[in-house]
Amino acid sequence: MDDNEYRHLTLENGLKVMLISNATADRAAASLDVNIGSLQDPVSRPGLAHFLEHMLFLGTKTYPEAGEYQKFIGQHGGSHNAFTAGEHTNYFFEIDPEQLNPALDRFSRFFHEPLFTEEYVQREKEAVNSEYRSKYKDDFRRSQYAMKAVMNPKHPASHFATGSLETLSDTGSEKVRDQLLEFYDKYYSANLMTLAVYGPQTLDELEKWIKPLFTPIKNQGTPLPSYNAPMFAKGQLPLDMKLKPVKDLLRLNLVFPVSEALSKYKQKPTHYLGHLLGHEGEGSLLNWLKNKGWAESLSAGLGNNNREGSLFQISIALTKDGLENVDAITEQAFSYIQLIKEKGVDEWIFDELQQIDALHFRFQEGRSPVSLVQQLTMNMHVYETDDLLIGDYLWKGYDPELIRHYLNALTPNNMLRIVSNQAFETDKHDPWFAAPYSVSTIDQSQVDTWSAAKSTEGINIPQQNPFIPEDVSLQSASTQSIPQRIYQEDGLSIYHQQDMSFKGPQSSVYISLRSPLAQQGPTNQLLLDAWVELLNDKLNPFSYPAQLAGQGFSLYTHMRGIGIRLYGYRDKQDVLLAKIIDEMKAYEPGQDKWDQIRQELKRAYQNSLLKKPYERSMAELTRTMLKPSYSEQDLLAALETVQLEDLLALQKQFWNKLDAVILGHGNISKAQLSSTGKLVESKLLAETEYQAVARKAVTILSSGEQAQAVEAKHKDSAMTLYIQGGGSELTERARMGLLGQMLHAPYYTYMRTERQYGYVVFATPYPILEQADRKSVV
């Protein structure tokens, strides 16, 4: 239930504002969104919008000290950030509510009195360049820029957006500071901005604060710019691209330019198509591809979505066999599109999606204040005022012709196909991230074959969802501050915490199955990983409709065994759990599935070694501090010799000795949780011997400094400094938490802004289990 009060207003300068008041809020937040981003960069200054975002944090007339804003936010338990997208630049912070007004004072001055100090203009170029370099080997970023390389060069979506020393350097009479000022004066106009503020103060008080602070923002009357060109020029498609990634990724992307969809937020035609094409249940495209052994996962929906055009994408993670059959997979995708044309445009599907999202909106769980204000500022540029809160969930006005309009754009003649594989031979590189690729036109005979694709036996439009909750009643309104143990026998402990804080029908149930096998070497660790992945794959067609209806689960490995988490609406959770348990006990994968999961795990372990340097150093830190822990190299070595028979043996052994712990939280009574416990006990623990499983041990460091090198295959480098606390007591952990909060802002300002040592810079508490620690990264 939403306890917030809202007020929408427009200031004298045209700035649209949403105020949110919640008397019980223990955090305050604000966001300002400019409906301008990197798509508005001057052709001669790629990255200027992003560079401007950086510069606004480096001093204003009233607060000229660089880092003063960051320091103030950090001193009062807050956080801040910003991002630049194609058509948005969004600034946001959260803070202790008592400091909201002075924080707004500092924040507001970004937008009417920034300094753009010459010294920091030069320094911040280095920070932008470091950000660019940090993503140089990021495969997602590389795939984006390979696609940009074949887009219409007249559309700004084809341009470089991050910025670098090269693009931001002064050239002759063109000074980047002058262009910053020109861009700021033109586009940072109140009529292109939206503001949202959240706090425990009354709406009248919030309005009284924001009017004098944000009214000084000038309204230049700047119109939203037009692009005057499509993302792909007429006759440019179809194209076939081969892309060589850094990591061992096998992927097929089918990309279709479609007309803009932002204004169609009520009818949601692209969401409708994404729901059908991205479905994972029985009879779905993904289910068919998995049964062939060709795909691991699939998603569908809008990618690049701007106010004059969009890209609809079908993205498929392939197996090795799938890579050998990309033409057949492509044909099957068009076969499914044909099936949608024949049977899939139906009002009952629209009504079901409407019903599900209405439930999600009605019972949405508490969002963080900063997430709420960010979303509202972006919605305010697109949605009608009455729809600002519900627009993301709104389905209104079933329009089959509108759905068919977008469906008719999903054709072989209107497609960019991208296949990713490390083994490809390529002959081109994109100019900014050096992504190796080659591109060719698609033969007309192949286009004709795909265009004639017919619907295939075994593939169907999804059936009606049986998991839509019927009982959304609430338990009594009592709330327990801490979990209470309601059952204790050797082998099973049950803890219950009824929490009605959010007044919703959702609950979470955590089931920890602790086995001594989990800590008996890397072979057992990878076998548990494999078992869980195979189970998730097996359960997916059954559980996917439940997930859509708001009843999800996750099955995962942890330090002492396997965990099951059920979350969402309480209704029908035990139906889902019973299916999970039955499959855990009965499922024995065949050789084909085993071979496939070995390939997946091998790629996953190898790709972990290619993560960014700071990610690698943090992972190595955790592995070093927790014993027993196994490196990717350990797991890869074990993977070379392990066989299907080893997995089947481990599955049987797993049930011999267990210690199970259950925690129920939220809208769940003791009686309901006890029923869940009996289900677990009868199906999983009836023939199991109890054995307690110890926690992993935290390494206690000796005094002095210890250095450890970590190999990283990347242009950048990283340093992680870890300082171990004096113990695990709550007071020591609180001290480390406070120290991290105090150090974050000055550390960031000195290491990044002043000294330019790196882009990813932070100091933070880093508890390992209950051990109090602090960590800094650069």
Show where each model-derived region lies:
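Mature N-terminal segment immediately following signal peptide/propeptide cleavage
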Residues: 1-29
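Short alpha-helical segments and helix-capping/turn motifs at coil-helix boundaries
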Residues: 16, 129, 179-181, 236-239, ...
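M16 family metallopeptidases and their MPP-like homologs
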Residues: 20, 25-38, 47-49, 65-110, ...
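Hydrophobic, small-residue-rich alpha-helical packing segments that form membrane-like cores
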Residues: 119-120, 125-134, 138-192, 197-211, ...
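His/Glu-based metal-binding/catalytic segments typifying zinc-dependent metallopeptidases
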Residues: 133, 222-282, 288, 367-393, ...
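Non-catalytic, conformational "gating/processing" segments within enzyme and secreted inhibitor domains
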Residues: 179-212, 644-680
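Glycine-centered hinge/linker elements that transmit conformational signals in sensory
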Residues: 207-223, 676-691
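Extended, domain-scale alpha-helical bundle/helix-rich regions
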Residues: 405-416, 422-425
